[in-house]
Amino acid sequence: MKVLVTGFDPFGGESINPAYVAVKMLPDEIAGAQIIKREIPTSFTRGTAEVVRQIELCQPDLVLNVGQAGGAAGLRVERVAINLADARIPDNDGAQPVDEPLVQDGAPAYFAKLPVKAMVRGVQAKGYPCQLSYTAGTYVCNAVMYTVLHTVQGYPHIRAGFVHVPYAASQLEGKAAGTPAMPLADITAALAAAIEAAVQNKTDLKEQMGRLD
């Protein structure tokens, strides 16, 4: 089995992006699966194009895109991506779309094609904070997640999804007191646990992880 794992380059004035730094630190094999690691640009246009190119090039069985969610206390396994670009800040190319569809006449939304609840429990079982999330935002992370899920409609054997990671502890300088973060080694280990659960579980757990908000 081949697993394509992507992380973004730095954006928003940050010197690093813990998503790709952690991805680079992953082992080359997890649960018997080959791990293919790629960096993609934080760009609505180039980021989505590059991840589609990598899918076509690598022909993976599973795709996990990883992004930074500053302010998150742990990993967030994303359940849904929406067909909307509404950027609070410009991307790395200076683009700042407002209320634009990602795919003209595309589906309003796609659900992740991964065992998201099993992934949450797998990360938690290793002692790392993790929760199921019902919004990947409206920035480039959501754009990549939506684009990948739209693309793999033509590749029924490919399973795909998205995980957000918190700030790395090394990014906290200059940020407000109490801003949550994790050591990069812990982010990497938590990602590995999520991938292991995704590889080992073809169907998801049947347990309550809903929200009231």
Short names for language-model regions:
Residues G70, P166-A169:
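Glycine-rich beta-alpha junction loops
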Residues A136-Y167:
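Active-site oxyanion/phosphate-handling segment shared across diverse enzymes
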Residues Q171-G174:
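A short acidic, helix-capping loop that chelates divalent metal ions and anchors anionic groups
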Residues M1-A136, H150-H157, A177-D213:
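N-terminal catalytic or cofactor-binding beta/alpha core of small enzyme domains
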